[in-house]
Regions:
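N-terminal export/assembly segments and adjacent metallocofactor-ligating motifs
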Residues: 2-13, 17, 53-55, 70-319, ...
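N-terminal cofactor/phosphate-binding cores enriched in small/glycine residues
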Residues: 9-69, 78-83
Length: 409
């Protein structure tokens, strides 16, 4: 069933059970909101969406009031505009005036609403909160209760999206504040450090601790990608500055996960730029020695590669030009990696050399021990196409059915 109403003298037809806010947005009419989010339940906490409804007593919150047939709504009445300005002035009167250094400057919803409604910073009106900034030892989530506008988004996100119910409000009136559990540290209250609360916070009262002081929204390029940690296929936006990932933000239109991310997906990106990350193939020295029998490396070239690699590292430290540049690329790429003793030390090689070695060893094992000597594990981190090819390679090339799949590999 449908319902027909008028919004600012515009005739609108929507499904029965819709709210005034949903009806207005379907008609292209903008109503300011602060506590509302399309993924969460509506509570009407901020009172920014108040509108005038004909024959109704007082102003109505558009996000919680259901439409009715024949209803007449005015979103821009003098009474509604004055009420919104008053709400904004009250919020700003107890809000830190640190926009110049705030992490969410430029993407703060309170800032946007003040601009939209023409509200400037009000004069001091009574007491102000002075909470300790970032008192919680959680390694991923930063909290500044002085910025909190008590919209309740984090409370609903934690309960409705993550099903943890870590956040809630304590006390009443001016003393109302956001607390974890029974006013505990987040982790003591059962927090999973998923960061949903920070993702839904409109003002930066909750923020990603790893991204503090790194880059603002207008300084980063957002790149949509898929999480590599498991097979769910969560999508999110990498916030990239100067070729480096500085933050991960949720993508509300992600098909598998929406705004939801786990702690690994949201905060486990530092491995990308970690110095220990392997970016080139490593082969044990004993296998490179074996290739000499096939004439791949001439006699003495392995020793030459070792000496060249050591000299390259010394030259890099002293700033001198490396003598390794005069070596052929096949030898220059085989720079010994320190930390292991020959013959088990790892050597950096080019991809062709590594793949040739693997193919040759596979052929030797199959010839000497048969196909049943192979055991293969696929991974949920691979795409369906990659796993299909892996399965085909195992059965048709290696000639074995010993293939399994691990969701956490």
């Amino acid at each position: 069933m449908t319902v027909t109403l008028t919004i600012n003298s515009q005739r609108v037809t929507v499904a029965q059970g819709s709210t005034i806010l949903e009806a207005a947005r379907s008609a292209g009419v903008s109503i300011p909101t602060l506590c509302h989010h399309r993924d969460l339940s509506n509570v009407g906490a901020c009172r920014m969406c108040v509108v005038s409804v004909e024959n109704a007593r007082g102003l109505q919150t558009a996000c919680t009031t259901p439409v009715a047939d024949g209803m007449a709504v005015n979103t821009e009445s003098q009474e509604a505009r004055e009420a919104r300005r008053f709400v904004l002035e009250m919020l700003l009167s107890d809000h830190p005036n640190d926009c110049l250094t705030c992490e969410v400057n430029g993407e703060c919803e309170l800032q946007d609403l003040a601009y939209e409604c023409g509200v400037t910073w009000p004069e001091q009106r009574g007491a102000r909160h002075a909470y300790e900034v970032n008192p919680d030892p959680n390694p991923f989530i930063f909290i500044d209760r002085n910025k909190c506008v008590l919209c309740g988004r984090c409370v609903r996100a934690c309960g409705e999206v993550q099903n943890r119910d870590v956040w809630n409000f304590a006390s009443r009136g001016f003393k109302s504040k956001l607390v974890a559990g029974a006013d505990q540290f987040m982790l003591d209250a059962g927090c999973e450090s998923c960061g949903q609360c920070a993702g839904y916070c409109p003002v930066g009262a909750l923020y990603d601790k790893m991204s503090l002081g790194v880059a603002r929204a207008n300084k980063v390029k957002k790149v949509r990608t898929t999480c590599s940690y498991c097979g769910v296929g969560c999508s999110f936006d990498l916030n990239v500055r100067d070729g480096k990932i500085v933050r991960v933000t949720s993508a509300s239109d992600a098909p598998a996960n929406g705004m939801a991310l786990c702690v690994k997906g949201r905060y486990g990106y530092d491995y990308v730029h970690h110095p220990d990350r392997l970016t080139r193939p490593l082969v044990r020295a004993k296998w490179l020695d074996a290739t000499q029998r096939d004439g791949r490396l001439a006699s003495g070239e392995w020793q030459a590669a070792t000496v060249a690699g050591k000299h390259a590292r010394r030259s890099a430290v002293s700033g001198q030009q490396s003598a390794v540049s005069s070596q052929p690329s096949a030898i220059r790429d085989q720079e010994p990696v320190p930390g292991l003793q020959s013959p088990d030390r790892f050597i950096q090689v080019d991809w062709d050399s590594a793949l040739d070695l693997v193919a040759r060893r596979f052929a030797e094992v199959k010839r000497e021990h048969g196909s049943e000597a192979f055991s293969v594990f696929a991974s949920a981190k691979c795409t369906n196409e990659e796993n299909y090819l892996f399965n085909k390679f195992t059965r048709q090339v290696l000639g074995t059915n010993n293939i399994d799949h691990c969701a956490r590999l």
